[in-house]
């Protein structure tokens, strides 16, 4: 029984492990060296983007028929995890490309898919997601951005807030009210291009973490777009937005895993080298207990995240629950693990000369975006009570 090597349950296929190794190699050489600089300057890590693009890791989820690598949901999560291990800001390149394009994959016309997905797959463009507004965060259905039909066009007016990679991305999935009397059933989704007249951007937000990924407001001032840029049928936008988040919360869980893994790896190396009272800090039982808890939480989060990724790929009925659970658990674990990593480094961990304080700051956002963890618990409870 112990010698049975073909038992593959709870073991990643070789091709997924190969993807991990390939991403890790690229990130070690061409992404990690830019992580501190991206954090210090707050500038988009173009060198990291170029490296990921060259290796086809910038938008791995896009199907082969649209020019993409055709990675499944688990492989995509592994890519994001490994990039986040090196640089959280850079991990938002593949993560947000998936977030922005998922509405097209779920509900877009074949023409829209061929027109836009191929540009993202080639690396010529990035795609962002515009759901939140200044007064519509967790309550996204209360948005006020309007889209009014005018012949063969729609005219959009409004403000979107907290838009990741805004100004860098060429394309945007924008959710807007087309029927003010229908609340969530009166919201529709559109593709807006950066070059459309009337599109502009606010100043970059001054953030705690993920500083290399710009976060800006997107202003829509009489933006006139062709009617064929609606994603799905009129009034189905909010449902598409929620279905999208079911899938992409898994990618935020993967991002949290990567940040936490990077912090644990660095802390392990540090405590083995650092000596106090005549021996390595790692030899103290109290430190070993901390490391054990960090590793345990991380592996539990990884198993849940990979299970959720499998459900995303299959389109399982319980994806809503598992996507929320993975995002919530992994991000809470990442915040705890990165905080403990800072503690293990002591005063050094509190300085910018060491990466763990950056990782702690980067981890915080994973508890907030794509639905706060309080909202995730509401989502999970509702799913449990439906059964």
Residue ranges and their predicted role:
Residues 1-90, 107-112, 119-123, 139, ...:
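Alpha-helical interface subdomain recognition
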Residues 71-72, 139-141, 165-170, 183-186, ...:
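Short glycine/proline-enriched turns and hinge-like loops at secondary-structure junctions
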Residues 93-95, 120, 135-138, 162-165, ...:
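Short Gly/Pro-enriched turn/cap motifs at secondary-structure boundaries
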Residues 98-107:
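Helix-loop "lid/cap" segments that line or gate small-molecule binding pockets
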Residues 123-131:
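A short, Trp-centered hydrophobic/proline-enriched beta-strand micro-motif
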Residues 128, 142-146, 153, 171-175, ...:
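Conserved hydrophobic/aromatic beta-strand scaffold that supports enzyme active sites
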Residues 142, 195-226:
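Flexible, small-/acidic-enriched active-site or ligand-binding loops
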Residues 157-201:
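A short core secondary-structure module
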């Amino acid at each position: 029984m112990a010698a049975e090597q073909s038992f593959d349950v709870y073991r990643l296929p070789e091709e997924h492990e190969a993807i991990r190794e390939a991403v890790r190699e690229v990130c070690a050489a061409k992404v990690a060296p830019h992580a501190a600089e991206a954090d210090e300057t707050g500038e988009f890590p173009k060198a990291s983007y170029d490296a990921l693009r060259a290796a086809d890791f910038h938008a791995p989820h896009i199907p082969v028929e649209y020019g993409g690598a055709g990675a499944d949901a688990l492989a995509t999560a592994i890519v994001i995890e490994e990039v986040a291990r090196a640089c959280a800001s850079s991990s938002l390149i593949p993560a947000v490309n998936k977030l922005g394009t998922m509405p097209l994959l779920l509900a877009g016309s074949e023409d829209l898919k061929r027109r836009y997905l191929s540009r993202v797959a080639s690396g010529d463009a990035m795609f962002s997601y515009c759901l939140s507004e200044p007064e519509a965060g967790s309550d996204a259905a209360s948005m006020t951005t309007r889209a009014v039909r005018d012949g063969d066009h729609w005219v959009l007016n409004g403000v979107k807030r907290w838009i990741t990679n805004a100004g860098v991305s060429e394309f945007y999935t924008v959710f807007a009210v087309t029927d003010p009397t229908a609340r969530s059933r009166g919201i529709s989704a559109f593709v807006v291009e950066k070059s459309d007249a009337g599109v502009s951007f606010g100043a970059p937000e001054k953030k705690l973490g993920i500083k290399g990924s710009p976060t800006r407001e997107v202003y829509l001032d009489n933006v006139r777009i062709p009617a064929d840029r609606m994603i799905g049928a009129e009034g189905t936008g909010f449902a598409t937005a929620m279905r999208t988040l079911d899938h992409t919360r898994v990618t935020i869980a993967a991002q949290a895993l990567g940040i936490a893994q990077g912090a644990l790896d660095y802390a392990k190396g540090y405590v083995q080298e650092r000596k106090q009272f005549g021996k390595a800090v790692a030899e103290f039982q109290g430190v070993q207990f901390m490391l054990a808890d960090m590793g345990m939480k991380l592996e539990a989060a990884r198993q849940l995240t990979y299970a959720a990724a499998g459900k995303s790929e299959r389109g399982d009925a319980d994806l809503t629950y598992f996507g929320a659970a993975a995002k919530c658990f992994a991000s809470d674990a990442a915040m705890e693990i990165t905080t403990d990593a800072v503690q293990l480094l002591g005063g050094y961990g509190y300085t910018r000369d060491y990466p763990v304080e950056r990782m702690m700051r980067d981890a915080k956002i994973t508890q907030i975006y794509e639905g706060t963890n309080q909202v995730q618990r509401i989502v999970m409870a509702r799913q449990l009570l439906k059964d």
